[in-house]
Amino acid sequence: MDRNPSPPSSDDESAPEGDCIGDTIYSKHWFFSTLTRLIEAVSEDKSQEGQEDEAPGDLDEELEDEICKVWDMSMNEEVALFLQGFNAPEILLGVIAKSKCSRLTEMCVGILGNMSCFLEPCMAISTHQSLGEVLLLLLSDADPPTLLETSRLFLTCLSQADVAGTWVERFRKDPSVRENLCFIMSSSTNVDLLVKVGELLDRLFDMDEDLMLAWIRSDCAPRETSAVTENEDRAAPLEMVSCLLEAAKQLRSESPEGLEIYMHVLQLLTTADTGIQAIVQSPDGGEQTWDFLLDLTCNDLCQPNDPPLIVQEQKGILSSVLAVMSAMFVWRAEQGHKVEKSLPLISSLAQVLENLEECRKKCPESDAREGPDARHDNSHLQILKDVSCEFLSNILSELSKDSVLQGISLGHITERRCQCALRNLLPLYSTSVGTFLAAVGEADRSLADTLRRETPVRAEQT
């Protein structure tokens, strides 16, 4: 079954007076009988364990259809409250614990996820200790739809401020949560699941920096050169950063929205020194991460033939990618990495800044029609500009005569791009601009004179 069937309409059957749930058309008796059938079916499967009459995982088609209806109806608040009053969390816990059918487990978790959209049922689900433990165990399940619904349930609960802390503490105390999420990111090809896991990590890391640091700290631990034990074989490669990168690669062509989520997770890591260390101190020194972000920036985002307004659409992912690369670049420069590998970024960053200038011309802040949404967009565009300028200033300050000559020969350093850089970097980054103009003067005196002549006031300090 590819999708859940719609709930029965009011014409399907006439419920006795007083049998309806609140103001809905849904029958209490129907729910009672459906949940009773569910309990009986699971109990019967349990009693027949070891017999070969039925293949494991089979579910009666009619019962599946009925449970799907419960799943759909549970999005209604009155139904969710009724299910809570009927002790549905306890019932569904028993079903999940006994079920050998992945589809049934998926549906039960989906019902709980829908109920969690409402505060009172969410609190009942979140404070149920045994249910919480079982749900955490489901992250090791091999069934992608079950994993998707489990991740959705966690994400929904984290959006409820009254119970979010309960779940964060559960995640913190159970090391298997981190390992299972890393395993999903590193091995799954299910786009919806990867996106949902990314959303879950994004919410968790944004809510609790201590949890984020705890989960990435092992990435920074010294690597043992001795042989690992059999139990360590699986855990050894599951580093948070490499798993995030693997998921991002999977989503690059499949889900731009999902890719943006993972880039924001990486950006969250760079807000702490431990996070930056986890990125740059991976076994390859962060080369895979750098190469992926470099290729993404130079070949996918904000291309020369794109309309300037593309930055409106890409402002989120651009801000995250450039922020991560900027943090990595500083470390790479300190470690003596050659700046020549970063020359294509001058073209990309200049393109971003030029497009931002065009956007400001077409959408001036003084526009009287500007509303909250426009102000929100403008603030994000300003963030993108700030990130781009800081990154570009870092690159320009590291250029030597030889690297400038190479940049000119490859077409990355042109008069137009240099003028764009000076317009945006001065006066805040005057020191970096001065260092850059000195290198340009050694490589191409004519270009340096032109740049100083066209920006005399701003370049005075240089």
UniProtKB/Swiss-Prot annotation:
One of its GO terms (cellular component) is nucleus. Belongs to the SAAL1 family. It comes from Xenopus tropicalis (Western clawed frog). Residues 1-21 are annotated as: Disordered. It is found in: Nucleus. The lineage of its organism: Eukaryota, Metazoa, Chordata, Craniata, Vertebrata. This is Protein saal1. Plays a role in promoting cell proliferation in response to pro-inflammatory stimuli. The keyword Phosphoprotein does not apply. Signal peptide: none annotated. It comes from the Eukaryota. Its main location: nucleus. Keywords: Nucleus. Disulfide bonds: none annotated.
